[in-house]
């Protein structure tokens, strides 16, 4: 899961959006460094990541990647799941338009950025004004995201090439998304994540 799915599941679970969004920027035990609700959000994010990676559908999705890209497939899939969520948002969340949801999340997160890691603050300079989460619905934007990540971190250079496997197996990935994401939503709603 990437930014959009973490915010969506956090909302369903009534968890801190700030904690869930910044979790990847916090190392180690967050207890004592942040308010309890933010710590709980960070921990929810980590549980969601762990659960998602262990799902049979996600393990199956990794098998669609070529050998040269399988190592980075967990990262590629995190971004791809956000693509399907953005693309099918109104089917999954019929009561709230995507932009309304994103605006609400932004209004909860931005006033509290001063207490967050600098790298996370820098992310927020681009995430909201460039409308990343709305643009996740656009497949060319997903290619751009993967390419930018590969340039920023040379060890992840294969991310850029992994997009060809997305194109080749797009519908298979989409079927797998529909098999697991509604279950994740239900787990979040019932506080079972």
UniProtKB/Swiss-Prot annotation:
Cite the Pfam families for this sequence: ACP_PD (PF04336)
Q: Does the keyword Cell wall biogenesis/degradation apply?
A: no
Task: Specify the domain of life of the species encoding this protein.
Answer: Bacteria
GO molecular function ontology, one term from the record: [acyl-carrier-protein] phosphodiesterase activity
Q: Provide this UniProt record's keywords sorted from A to Z.
A: Fatty acid biosynthesis, Fatty acid metabolism, Hydrolase, Lipid biosynthesis, Lipid metabolism
Q: Which EC number(s) does the record attach to this protein?
A: 3.1.4.14
Keyword Hydrolase in the entry? The reply is yes
* UniProt record, GO biological process: fatty acid biosynthetic process
Provide the reaction this enzyme catalyses. Answer: holo-[ACP] + H2O = apo-[ACP] + (R)-4'-phosphopantetheine + H(+)
Summarizing the function annotation, the protein's role is:
Converts holo-ACP to apo-ACP by hydrolytic cleavage of the phosphopantetheine prosthetic group from ACP.
Give the family per the record: Belongs to the AcpH family.
Q: Which PANTHER family match?
A: ACYL CARRIER PROTEIN PHOSPHODIESTERASE
Protein name as annotated: Acyl carrier protein phosphodiesterase
């Amino acid at each position: 899961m990437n930014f959009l799915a973490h915010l969506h599941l956090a909302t369903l679970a009534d968890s801190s959006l700030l904690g869930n969004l910044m979790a990847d920027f916090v190392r180690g035990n967050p207890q004592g460094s942040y308010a309890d609700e933010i710590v709980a959000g960070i921990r929810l994010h980590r549980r969601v990541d762990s659960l998602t990676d262990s799902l049979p559908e996600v393990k199956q999705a990794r098998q669609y990647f070529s050998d040269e890209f399988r190592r980075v497939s967990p990262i590629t899939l995190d971004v791809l799941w956000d693509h399907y969520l953005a693309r099918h948002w109104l089917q999954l969340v019929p009561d709230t338009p995507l932009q309304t949801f994103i605006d609400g999340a932004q209004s909860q997160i931005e006033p509290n950025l001063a207490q967050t890691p600098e790298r996370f603050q820098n992310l927020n300079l681009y995430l909201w004004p460039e409308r990343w989460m709305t643009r996740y619905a656009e497949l060319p934007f997903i290619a751009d995201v993967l390419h930018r990540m590969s340039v920023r971190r040379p060890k992840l250079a294969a991310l850029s090439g992994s997009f060809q496997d997305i194109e080749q197996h797009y519908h298979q990935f989409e079927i797998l998304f529909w098999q697991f994401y509604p279950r994740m939503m239900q787990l979040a709603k019932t506080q079972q994540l």
